[in-house]
C-alpha cells in the first residue's frame, strides 16, 4: 500500500488535492461530512453559503481546473453548473470511490508515525485511523462573522437578522424594508437580487469600495485585473504607482462610485478595496438601492447610522465575512499554528515547519476566483511530498511565519494573481515568457488561466500553448501580440532601472 493521505473536505480544494496527490502515487482518502461532494457548491441550505439563484462572478475559464473545461459557452455560471462540474471532475479522475460521504471529522492529532483522524458517520459509528499525511481542505467560509452592534439582539423586524451565508431566496423579503450590511461580493449580490424582486434596500457600509463590473467592454473583468503584470509591477514598482495603475483600470471599466450617487471612495484602491458586481451601481443611480454609513445601534426595528440618522427595517442581512473555524484540530496543532478566527500561521498558507506531513488548503482570504490558486497549491503540496520539487527550507519557513505574525492586526485580504503566482513559483510551473515569445502579451496582460501553468515545469503539456492562446483570446480580449499603448508604457516602466 502506498503512502496514505487523509483529505478533509471534498469540495474544490479537496478534489484537486486528491487528483494531484494520486498522480504522485499517494493514496488519498477524502472525508466529506455532507452526503454529496462539492463543498459550498452543493448549495445545501444551512450547510453552505451558496443560494440557488447565485451565479459566479468569475469567468468560466478562471473557475475551472486545468484538465477539464466547462461544458457550454456561458461566461458566468450558475452554482448548479459548478456543482455538476465538480462531480464530472471527480468521475474523470476516478476520485468518487476515494470519498467517504456523510463522514465528519471530529479530531485530528499527531500519532506515533503520522496523524490520527477520528471520524463519525451516522448516529453512533465512530472510527479512528492513522494516516501518513493530512491535507485540511475544508475552506474558510463556514462560520459567518456578524459584527457586534449595540441592541442588535433586540431587533424586532419580522424578517429578523441573518447573514448572507444563510440567505436562500428573495421571496421572504418581497415588499419589505431590508438593510444589507457590508460591501463585499455576497452583500452586493444579495442587495441587487432583493432590489430586483420588490424589496426596499439600504446598504450600510464602513467604507465605500470601488465596484468593478463583471463585464467591461465585453471582457470579464477578472481577465483584466488579475494578471501576471500586476504581480510583477507590485514587486518592482512603487506601491503608489501600482495602486494608481489598478485604480485606473477599475474606474475606466465601470466608473467611480460617486458618479452613480454612492459615497466617494478613498483615492487609493488598496485602501478602499474593490468588489465585483454588474448591477449594483446602476441600481444606486436609479435610487433602488440607497447607501448609508455603518450602523451604530439598533432599538426594536429602528437602526441608527454613523451620521446620526435613523430608519426602521423589517429585516437585516449581514455580508461581513467569515471567521476561520477548524474545530477538529487538537490543542497541540491549534497552538502550533496559533489559530484564531482570522489567522493561521503557515508558510505561504500551506506548511508549518513543526507539523511535517500536514498541509492546509484554501485558508486565505482573497479577491478573485479560487480555482486556479487552489490547483497550484495542490500541485505544490503533491510535488513537495512526492519529491518533484525541493521541500521548503525550514529556516526560511520560520522567517516567513514570523513575518506573517508581524502583520497580524492588519488587513489580511490578498488577490488571486498574487496567490496563484506564489504557488506556481513554489511548484516550479510559473511560465517563462522568454520560452514563449508568441505568447508574451498574453502571459503578461492576459488571464491567469490554468492552461498557462502547463507550459513549463512539471506536468507541462504539449498542447498548452494553443490552449492558453485560446483562453487569452476568449471574449475578444487578446487576439494579437501587439501591445496597446498603455501596455507598452506599463511594460517599459518595468524595464526602467
Q: What is each PLM-predicted segment?
A:
Residues 7, 209-213, 357-497:
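C-terminal, flexible cofactor-proximal segment of oxidoreductases
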Residues 7, 12-96, 205-214:
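Beta1-alpha1 glycine-rich phosphate/pyrophosphate-binding loop at the start
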Residues 2-4, 102, 174-175, 300:
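Phosphate-coordination loops involved in phosphoryl transfer and adenosine-cofactor binding
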Residues 52, 177, 319-389:
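Glycine/threonine-rich phosphate-binding loop and adjacent beta-strand/alpha-helix elements that clamp
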Residues 75-142, 284, 298-299:
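Feature captures the FAD/FMN-dependent oxidoreductase FAD-binding
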Residues 6-37, 129, 134-282, 289-292, ...:
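Rossmann-like dinucleotide-binding core of oxidoreductases
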Residues 278-283, 294, 306, 310-325:
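Glycine-rich, aromatic-lined ligand/substrate-binding cores of catalytic
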Residues 64-78, 116, 174, 260-271:
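Helix-loop-beta segment of a Rossmann-like dinucleotide-binding subdomain
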Amino acid at each position: 500500500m502506498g503512502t496514505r493521505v487523509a483529505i478533509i473536505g471534498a469540495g474544490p480544494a479537496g478534489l484537486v488535492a486528491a487528483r494531484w496527490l494520486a498522480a504522485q502515487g499517494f493514496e488519498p482518502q477524502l472525508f466529506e461530512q455532507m452526503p454529496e461532494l462539492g463543498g459550498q457548491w452543493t448549495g445545501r441550505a444551512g450547510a453552505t453559503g451558496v443560494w440557488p439563484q447565485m451565479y459566479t462572478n468569475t469567468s468560466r475559464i478562471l473557475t475551472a481546473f486545468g484538465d477539464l473545461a466547462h461544458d457550454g459557452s456561458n461566461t458566468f455560471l450558475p452554482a448548479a453548473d459548478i456543482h455538476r462540474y465538480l462531480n464530472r471532475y471527480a468521475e474523470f479522475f476516478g476520485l468518487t470511490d476515494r470519498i467517504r460521504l456523510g463522514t465528519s471529522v471530529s479530531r485530528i492529532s499527531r500519532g506515533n508515525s503520522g496523524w490520527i483522524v477520528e471520524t463519525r458517520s451516522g448516529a453512533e459509528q465512530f472510527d479512528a485511523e492513522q494516516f501518513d499525511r493530512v491535507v485540511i481542505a475544508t475552506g474558510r467560509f463556514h462560520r459567518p462573522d456578524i459584527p457586534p452592534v449595540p441592541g442588535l439582539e433586540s431587533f424586532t423586524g419580522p424578517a429578523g437578522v441573518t447573514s448572507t451565508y444563510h440567505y436562500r431566496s428573495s421571496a421572504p423579503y418581497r415588499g419589505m424594508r431590508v438593510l444589507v450590511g457590508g460591501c463585499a461580493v455576497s452583500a452586493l449580490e444579495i442587495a441587487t437580487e432583493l432590489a430586483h424582486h420588490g424589496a426596499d434596500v439600504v446598504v450600510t457600509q464602513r467604507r465605500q469600495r470601488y465596484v468593478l463590473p463583471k463585464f467591461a467592454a465585453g471582457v470579464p473583468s477578472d481577465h483584466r485585473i488579475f494578471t501576471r503584470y500586476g504581480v510583477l509591477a507590485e514587486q518592482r514598482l512603487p506601491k503608489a504607482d501600482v495602486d494608481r495603475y489598478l485604480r485606473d483600470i477599475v474606474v475606466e471599466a465601470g466608473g467611480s462610485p460617486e458618479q452613480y450617487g454612492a459615497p466617494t471612495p478613498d483615492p487609493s484602491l488598496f485602501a478602499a478595496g474593490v468588489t465585483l458586481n454588474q448591477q449594483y451601481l446602476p441600481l444606486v443611480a436609479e435610487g433602488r438601492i440607497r447607501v448609508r454609513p455603518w450602523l451604530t445601534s439598533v432599538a426594536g426595528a429602528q437602526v441608527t447610522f454613523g451620521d446620526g440618522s435613523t430608519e426602521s427595517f423589517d429585516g437585516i442581512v449581514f455580508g461581513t465575512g467569515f471567521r476561520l473555524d477548524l474545530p477538529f484540530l487538537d490543542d497541540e496543532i491549534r497552538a502550533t499554528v496559533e489559530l484564531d478566527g482570522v489567522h493561521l500561521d503557515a508558510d505561504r498558507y500551506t506548511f508549518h515547519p513543526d507539523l511535517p506531513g500536514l498541509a492546509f488548503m484554501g485558508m486565505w482570504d482573497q479577491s478573485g476566483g479560487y480555482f486556479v490558486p487552489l490547483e497550484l497549491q495542490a500541485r505544490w503540496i503533491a510535488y513537495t511530498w512526492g519529491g518533484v520539487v525541493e521541500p521548503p527550507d525550514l529556516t526560511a519557513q520560520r522567517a516567513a511565519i514570523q513575518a506573517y505574525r508581524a502583520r497580524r492586526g492588519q488587513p489580511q485580504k490578498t488577490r488571486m494573481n498574487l496567490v496563484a503566482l506564489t504557488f506556481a513559483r513554489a511548484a516550479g510551473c510559473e511560465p517563462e515568457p522568454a520560452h514563449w515569445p508568441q505568447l508574451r502579451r498574453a502571459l503578461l496582460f492576459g488571464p491567469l488561466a490554468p492552461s498557462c501553468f502547463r507550459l513549463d515545469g512539471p506536468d507541462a503539456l504539449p498542447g498548452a500553448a494553443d490552449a492558453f492562446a485560446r483562453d487569452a483570446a476568449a471574449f475578444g480580449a487578446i487576439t494579437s501580440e501587439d501591445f496597446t499603448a498603455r501596455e507598452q508604457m506599463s511594460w517599459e516602466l518595468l524595464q526602467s532601472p
